[in-house]
A protein has these predicted regions:
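Loop-centered beta-sheet repeat module
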Residues: 134, 138-203
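Residue register of alpha-helical TPR repeats
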Residues: 7, 46, 85, 119, ...
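Helix-turn-helix repeat elements of alpha-solenoid scaffolds
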Residues: 17-31, 56-71, 92-108, 131-142, ...
Length: 354
């Protein structure tokens, strides 16, 4: 068994993952898996690294603990490039588990092992974007965009541009976000990339809702493929669009259907109940539910949801003369802006509405 050949397979698989070439990636993994006696060869540690990469990249429901234990036994023979790949995949596993601090720790390790790879920078920008560290996210987006162009990794480039659009959206630069999203939407249609199309249309529904552009919101919502219509955010946006459009009968039907089917998301359940209370002219109950939504979003580090809820609370506090609460919302929105320039974790801020 030529260990060097399997080491090159590790590099090939990581490169195919970077370029989003899933079919070729899985063919390469299958070739390795079908190699006779590889688990007992000098390349056995690379073999288990490839099994680990397969499990995480393809999000398979397997226990990866055994793979990692074996890899740890043999990682001292890995090249620095293999080590950087290993730690980046460990970071990706933690990202899927929403264990952000641990993911950042593994990315730092990957970077230490000569790991200035596109995907490591891409993972940094994704995490910082989720946490609301917008200056840091922007730095890594710019760096990753340059690397993607240099490496001709155009499929990955589109996802980086999507991140740029999301950053515009999070920082209330909606015109810039919409302009970029529409360009990416056209590209996704040309490429017949349904997942990219769904991501972009979802964001366009969100920006339309924020801007109360009801017609555009429904237009984008109706263009999303049926396979994605179970998305709870999209269902929630639909109810909200009916409410903004004064289609109260449809809004009530939408809310009733949502509450019958929502199970595991307290955020969505509280948001829809708040909307129902607004329609039932029970503003104080609506406010209480929105405040619960805010705390849930904050706890989960979901910046976009937290800001969206604050916008609803801002209008309600203003309408019902709750000046102390209104002042607090302004402070929270300012703190979110300041937070984007600071090195702190969103869960540690401890912002309270009461």
């Amino acid at each position: 068994m030529d260990r060097g050949l399997i080491v090159n397979r590790v590099y090939d698989i990581y490169g195919l993952y970077t370029d989003l070439k899933k079919e070729e990636l899985n063919k390469t993994i299958k070739i390795v898996k079908d190699t006779k006696n590889i688990a007992c060869s000098y390349a056995r540690f690379e073999y288990y690294l490839i099994l680990y990469m397969d499990a995480i990249i393809n999000q398979k429901e397997v226990d990866t603990a055994l793979y990692k234990r074996i890899i740890e036994l043999g990682k001292n023979i890995f090249s620095v490039r293999e080590l950087s790949i290993y730690y980046d995949i460990m970071a990706l596993e933690k990202m899927y588990l929403n264990e952000t601090k641990e993911a950042l720790g593994y990315l730092d390790k990957a970077l230490c092992y000569n790991g200035n790879h596109l995907m490591i920078n891409y993972h940094y920008c994704s995490i910082y974007l989720d946490l609301g560290y917008f200056n840091l996210a922007q730095q890594y987006i710019h760096k990753s965009l340059r690397m993607a162009v240099q490496q001709l990794s155009f499929d990955r480039l589109y996802y980086l541009l999507l991140n740029q659009g999301v950053l515009y959206m999070y920082t209330s630069r909606y015109d810039e976000a919409n302009k970029l999203f529409l360009k990416l939407l056209n590209e996704s249609i040309k490429r017949q990339n349904e997942i990219m199309k769904y991501c972009i249309l979802s964001n366009l529904v969100f920006t339309s809702l924020i801007q109360k552009d009801i017609k555009s919101g429904f237009d984008y919502l109706n263009r999303i493929d049926e396979q994605f219509t179970d998305d709870l955010d999209l269902k929630m946006y639909k109810c909200h669009l009916y409410y903004f459009d004064n289609e109260y009968t449809k809004a009530k039907e939408c809310i009733a259907s949502f509450l019958r089917n929502v199970k595991d998301s307290k955020y969505h359940e509280n948001f829809i109940r708040a909307l129902k209370y607004m329609m039932d002219n029970k503003p104080m109950k609506a406010i209480a539910n929105f405040e619960t939504c805010y705390q849930i979003a904050l706890k989960n580090g979901q910046y976009d949801r937290a800001i969206f809820v604050l916008k609803q609370l801002n209008e309600l506090y203003l309408d019902f003369g709750l000046q102390n609460k209104l002042k607090k919302v302004k402070e929270l929105q300012e703190n979110f802006y300041k937070m984007s320039h600071a090195n702190q974790i969103i869960e540690d801020i401890g912002l309270k509405l009461n």
